[in-house]
């Protein structure tokens, strides 16, 4: 017997390099494919090709997409990709009955309630989980920040642009780094330090402070040298990265009252979970003076699921 088309949804996580599409049913997904976005002129071409290749009984009429960039109306423009589209027009072009488009990090945040325990790696002493708001923060291409609030058995997503809030230095050494960064950007956002490019910015700022010429490094170069211990400045850059992420995560926990925990997503730290666990992140997270005991009770967990945005989209409430 064929599957119910109303039970199926096509889901897609559209990044700057790849578009990942899958078919979701009852919170799980299958038929995963990675398509290189450089091969397509528009999103409708990539998604249309994916749908056309599916067996007839697996072609959904409903969809949910996650895109890198703000979603506040019908017209959507991706941040790191020369694609833009109308949600209404895309829905019509593909003959879909419903189509929901959300920010990619919002979709990642929506995955948290559905993550198995094995995909939640504790950073710091394990804490018993309690009910309450959940914060999600993720350094990657940018810095994603979202929150989830429980309400009568469901979760309400609070998306935002917290990665563009002001970067808060917590030590004199960090203040010097921020001063160097301010010579490049009048407003130094958290994302300027807590992202892939931000890690390079930290390395270059430290080189400036140390009076040496920086090597032309990529984010992967910085982390590779840091993990091997072959470059003291890269080691310091990774340490500062983890420390400042702890400060920002602690601020998020206090702001939303994240008694349900703070979850960290993003590919940067996923590859170095042991080094991250032994970094100053957790100490800095708790270092909030009178509220240290409050933060000590809040768990911080690294998301190990490789495609959390797809898991979130698979469970995103859709119009009937």
UniProtKB/Swiss-Prot annotation:
It is found in: Cytoplasm. The gene is glk. It holds the Pfam family Glucokinase. The keyword Signal does not apply. ATP binds at residues 12-17. Belongs to the bacterial glucokinase family. Coiled coil: none annotated. This is Glucokinase. One of its GO terms (cellular component) is cytosol. GO terms for biological process: glycolytic process. Its EC number is 2.7.1.2. Signal peptide: none annotated. Keywords: ATP-binding, Cytoplasm, Glycolysis, Kinase, Nucleotide-binding, Plasmid, Transferase. It catalyses: D-glucose + ATP = D-glucose 6-phosphate + ADP + H(+). It comes from Nitrobacter hamburgensis (strain DSM 10229 / NCIMB 13809 / X14). InterPro entries: ATPase_NBD, Bacterial_glucokinase, Glucokinase. One of its GO terms (molecular function) is glucokinase activity.
């Amino acid at each position: 017997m064929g599957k119910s088309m109303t039970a199926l949804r096509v889901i897609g996580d559209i990044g700057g390099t790849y578009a990942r599409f899958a078919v979701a049913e009852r919170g799980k997904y299958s038929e995963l494919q990675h398509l290189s976005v450089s091969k397509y002129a528009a999103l409708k071409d990539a998604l249309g090709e994916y749908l056309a290749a599916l067996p007839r009984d697996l072609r959904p009429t409903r969809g949910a997409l996650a895109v890198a960039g703000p979603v506040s109306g019908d017209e959507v423009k991706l941040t790191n990709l020369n694609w833009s589209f109308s949600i209404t027009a895309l829905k019509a072009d593909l003959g879909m009955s419903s189509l929901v488009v959300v920010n990619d990090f919002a979709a990642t945040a929506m995955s948290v309630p559905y993550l198995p325990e094995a995909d939640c790696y504790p950073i710091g002493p394990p804490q018993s989980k309690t009910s309450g708001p959940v914060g999600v923060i993720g350094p990657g291409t940018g810095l994603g920040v979202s929150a989830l609030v429980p309400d009568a058995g469901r979760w309400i997503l609070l998306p935002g642009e917290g990665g563009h809030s002001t970067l808060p230095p917590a030590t004199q050494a960090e203040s010097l780094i921020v001063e160097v960064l301010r010579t490049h950007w009048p407003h130094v956002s958290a994302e300027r330090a807590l992202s892939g490019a931000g890690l390079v910015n930290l390395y270059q700022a430290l080189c400036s402070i140390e009076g040496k010429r920086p090597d032309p490094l990529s984010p992967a170069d910085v982390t590779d040298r840091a993990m091997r211990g072959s470059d003291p400045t890269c080691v310091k850059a990774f340490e500062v990265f983890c420390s400042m992420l702890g400060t920002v995560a602690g601020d998020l926990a206090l702001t939303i009252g994240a008694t349900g925990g703070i979850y960290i997503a993003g590919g940067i730290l996923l590859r170095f979970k042991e080094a991250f666990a032994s970094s100053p992140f957790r100490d800095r997270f708790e270092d909030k003076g009178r509220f240290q005991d409050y933060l000590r009770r809040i768990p911080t967990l690294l998301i190990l699921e490789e495609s959390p945005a797809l898991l979130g989209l698979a469970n995103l409430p859709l119009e009937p």
